[in-house]
C-alpha cells in the first residue's frame, strides 16, 4: 500500500542530542581531545572575565566559543555569520559546541567582541600548547628532531588600499583615482595599506607582489605534528628569525641543554648567521645545502650523515600542514586584519590540524593493535 506524503511533527522527543551523532564519527575523538586541552585552561579562561562577586550577566562560556571557532576551521566555514546560520539547523554542530536543541544561537558579533579578549590572554596559544602536550603524552612527538618552514598568507587587503603613507585626500575629494598606481614606484618604506596597516607588499620566487603575512611552523619529524606556529610580517629575514625563536622555545621545552636536537629546513635557511645560531643552541642544522654559485654554510661533515638524509626526507611532512591549512582551514587568504588577529587564526588552524592528525594516528594505532 502506498504511503501518504504527510508530515506530523512531534511536540516532544525522548532522544538526546548525543544520539544523533554516529558512534564512529571523527568529531567524537576530536572533541574529546579538544575538551581535554580546554580543561587545562580553566585559570586562563576565568581570568578573562570579572569576578563573580561583582555580579553581572554570565558570558557565553569561552570553551563553547573556542569549540565554535574550531568548527569554523574544520568545516571551512567562510564567516562567523554563516557559522551561526549553520549552527541553527545542524545538530552535529550544536553537539560539538555544547548547545542543546533548544538553546538560542549567538549573534555573529559575539566573535568580534571576544576575539580581543582571547588575544589579550593568549587563550588560543595556550590551547595550542595544551594540544601539543597531549600529543607528547601519547608518545606522538620525538621532542628532538624538527623541521621548519614558512608560507605566504594573503592579507585581507588589496592593491588599491596600498597608498603613500603621507597621502591625505583633498577636501573636495580630488586627487588620483583609487588604485591608479601605474608608473609609481611603491615600497613598504613609502607606502602602507589603509585596510590592514600590518600587511606588507611582498613577493617570493615567481609569485606576484601581494599584500601578505608570513606564517611559520615547526613540525616534529616523528609524525609531522606542528610543535610551534607563529605569524610575522612578510620580509626576507622573517623565516630565519622565526625559526630561531621557535627552535629556542623547543630547546627550553626539552629541558636538557645537552640533549641532541636536529632541525631540517630548505635552502632558504642556508645562511651563515642562521647556521651559527643553531650551533650555539646545540641544534644540528640539517638544512638543505645551497651551492648555486656559492659555498654552503652547512658543513659537509653534517650533510654526509644518515641523520641529515633522514631529516631532508622527513621535512616534507611540514608541507602537509600548510596544505591542509590553506585548503581546509582558509589560511590562503585570511578574513581578519591585523598581525595579532592573523596570528591567532593561524595558530588555531594549526591546533585544528593537530587534532585531526592525532585522531588519524590514533586510528592507525588501534588498527595495528587489532
Feature-to-residue mapping (PLM):
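Charged, often Cys/His-bearing segments associated with DNA-binding zinc-finger transcription factors
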Residues: 1-37, 181, 358-370
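Secondary-structure transition/capping motifs at alpha-helix termini
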Residues: 75-81, 93-94, 102-103, 250-259, ...
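Polybasic low-complexity intrinsically disordered regions
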Residues: 88, 97-277, 353, 359
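Basic, low-complexity intrinsically disordered segments
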Residues: 2-5, 30-140, 155
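Helix-centered, glycine/charged polyanion-binding patches within enzymatic domains
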Residues: 167, 171, 177-178, 267-340, ...
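C-terminal extensions of enzymes
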Residues: 330-370
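Secondary-structure capping and boundary motifs in well-ordered enzyme cores
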Residues: 22, 26, 56-64, 79, ...
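Arg/Lys-rich, glycine/proline-spaced intrinsically disordered segments
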Residues: 52-57, 291-298, 365
Amino acid at each position: 500500500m502506498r504511503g501518504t506524503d504527510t508530515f506530523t511533527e512531534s511536540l516532544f522527543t525522548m532522544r538526546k542530542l548525543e544520539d544523533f551523532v554516529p558512534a564512529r564519527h571523527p568529531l567524537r575523538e576530536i572533541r574529546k581531545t579538544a575538551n581535554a586541552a580546554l580543561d587545562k585552561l580553566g585559570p586562563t579562561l576565568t581570568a578573562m572575565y570579572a569576578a563573580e562577586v561583582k555580579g553581572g550577566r554570565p558570558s557565553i562560556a569561552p570553551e563553547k566559543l573556542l569549540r565554535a571557532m574550531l568548527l569554523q576551521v574544520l568545516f571551512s566555514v567562510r564567516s562567523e555569520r554563516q557559522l551561526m546560520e549553520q549552527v541553527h539547523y545542524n545538530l552535529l554542530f550544536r553537539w560539538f559546541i555544547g548547545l542543546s536543541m533548544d538553546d538560542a544561537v549567538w549573534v555573529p558579533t559575539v566573535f568580534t567582541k571576544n576575539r580581543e579578549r582571547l588575544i589579550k590572554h593568549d587563550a588560543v596559544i595556550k590551547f595550542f600548547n595544551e594540544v601539543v602536550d597531549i600529543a607528547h603524552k601519547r608518545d606522538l612527538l620525538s621532542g628532538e628532531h624538527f623541521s621548519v618552514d614558512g608560507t605566504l598568507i594573503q592579507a585581507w587587503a588589496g592593491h588599491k588600499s596600498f597608498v603613500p603613507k603621507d597621502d591625505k585626500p583633498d577636501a573636495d575629494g580630488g586627487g588620483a583615482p583609487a588604485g591608479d598606481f601605474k608608473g609609481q614606484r611603491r615600497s613598504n618604506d613609502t607606502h602602507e595599506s589603509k585596510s590592514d596597516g600590518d600587511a606588507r607588499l611582498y613577493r617570493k620566487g615567481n609569485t606576484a607582489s601581494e599584500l601578505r603575512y608570513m606564517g611559520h611552523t615547526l613540525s616534529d619529524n616523528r609524525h609531522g605534528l606542528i610543535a610551534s606556529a607563529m605569524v610575522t610580517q612578510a620580509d626576507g629575514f622573517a623565516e630565519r628569525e622565526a625559526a630561531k625563536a621557535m627552535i629556542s622555545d623547543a630547546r627550553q621545552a626539552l629541558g636538557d641543554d645537552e640533549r641532541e636536537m636536529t632541525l631540517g629546513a630548505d635552502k632558504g635557511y642556508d645562511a651563515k648567521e642562521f647556521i651559527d645560531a643553531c650551533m650555539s643552541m646545540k641544534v644540528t642544522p640539517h638544512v638543505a645545502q645551497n651551492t648555486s654559485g656559492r659555498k654552503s654554510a652547512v658543513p659537509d661533515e653534517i650533510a654526509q650523515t644518515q641523520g641529515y638524509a633522514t631529516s631532508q626526507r622527513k621535512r616534507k611532512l611540514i608541507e602537509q600542514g600548510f596544505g591542509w591549512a590553506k585548503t581546509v582551514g582558509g589560511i590562503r587568504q585570511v578574513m581578519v586584519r591585523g598581525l595579532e588577529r592573523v596570528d591567532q587564526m593561524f595558530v588555531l588552524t594549526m591546533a585544528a590540524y593537530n587534532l585531526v592528525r592525532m585522531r588519524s594516528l590514533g586510528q592507525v594505532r588501534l588498527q595495528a593493535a587489532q
